Design a protein with these regions (language model features):
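Conserved ABC ATPase "signature" region
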Residues: 105-123, 175
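A short, proline-enriched helix->beta-strand linker immediately N-terminal to the Walker B motif
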Residues: 146-150
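Conserved ABC ATPase signature
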Residues: 127-131, 135
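ABC-type ATPase nucleotide-binding domains, specifically the catalytic core motifs of the NBD
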Residues: 16, 56, 89, 93-108, ...
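Helix-to-loop junction immediately C-terminal to a conserved catalytic motif
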Residues: 52
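The feature captures the beta-strand-to-loop junction immediately N-terminal to the Walker
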Residues: 37-39
């Protein structure tokens, strides 16, 4: 059996007369972390929405685990820059909302385990308005992980946080991925974030977007962005972006 969990072939998308995605093809191995960077407005989020099943391409196909994607499925979860926590539910209730098919006691135990995993033990009964922005992002991450998705689709998940909290969340995500196996597709404007987290970085061209370059990040975790290898990779990616 192929280890290619996601296969994207010839994806093209326009909105009216505006071409946005132009023949994008790539694949993602099971358990691989792929980051996608590109100029603002180039079509990164549109491409991710197509892969996740929220948008239909004009041409091309997306195959997940050998099955052609025709819409969203429970094997993948989207985490975006926009908050998606239910404000009328507690932290624990937010995590339990998507759990089905097990007992209330089992759901509570599972929710509490993931709340602790993201460092929020003791805040189970807190409401979103009582939490900081960084804590809310931890709730979103825990709520995504508690349903045990095979794939995490992440659309600039930490971009609304301040620089220090963004770095903390990157470290938190990396720690969790060392404990649990997930395939990850990350959209980001932050080249250093891509290098810190990903196994591979795809650089997209301006709209209509296509894959302009691919970089393999052959650096062990935990990574030091100040290392000569990381700095060299950063410069190469920025050069592709015209910076």
């Amino acid at each position: 059996m192929s280890d290619k969990q996601i296969v994207v072939e010839g994806i093209t998308k326009s909105f009216g007369t505006l071409p946005v995605v132009d023949g994008v093809s790539f694949d993602v191995r099971d358990g691989e972390f792929v980051a996608i960077v590109g100029p603002s407005g180039c079509g990164k989020s549109t491409l991710l929405n197509i892969i996740a099943g929220f948008e239909r391409p004009d041409r091309g196909t997306v195959t997940i685990d050998g099955v052609r994607r025709t819409g969203p499925s429970r094997n993948g979860i989207m985490i975006s820059q926009h908050g998606s926590v239910f404000p009328w539910l507690t932290v624990q209730e937010n995590l339990m909302f998507g759990l089905r098919g097990t007992s209330q006691a089992d759901n509570t135990e599972l929710a509490d385990r993931y709340i602790a995993m993201v460092g929020l033990a003791g805040f189970e009964t807190a409401y979103p308005h009582e939490l900081s922005g960084g804590m809310l992002k931890r709730v979103e991450l825990a709520r995504a992980l508690v349903v045990k998705p095979e794939i995490l689709y992440m659309d600039e998940p930490f971009s609304a946080l301040d620089a220090l909290m963004s770095l903390r969340m990157q470290n938190e995500l990396r720690r969790i991925l060392d404990e649990e196996r997930h395939t990850v597709l990350l959209i980001t404007h932050d080249v250093e974030e891509a290098i810190f987290l990903a196994d591979r970085v795809l650089v997209l061209s301006p709209r209509p977007t296509a894959i302009q370059a691919t970089f393999h990040v052959d650096l062990p975790h935990p990574r030091k962005l100040s290392s000569p290898q990381a700095q060299s990779l950063r410069e190469a990616i920025l050069k592709e972006l015209g910076l």
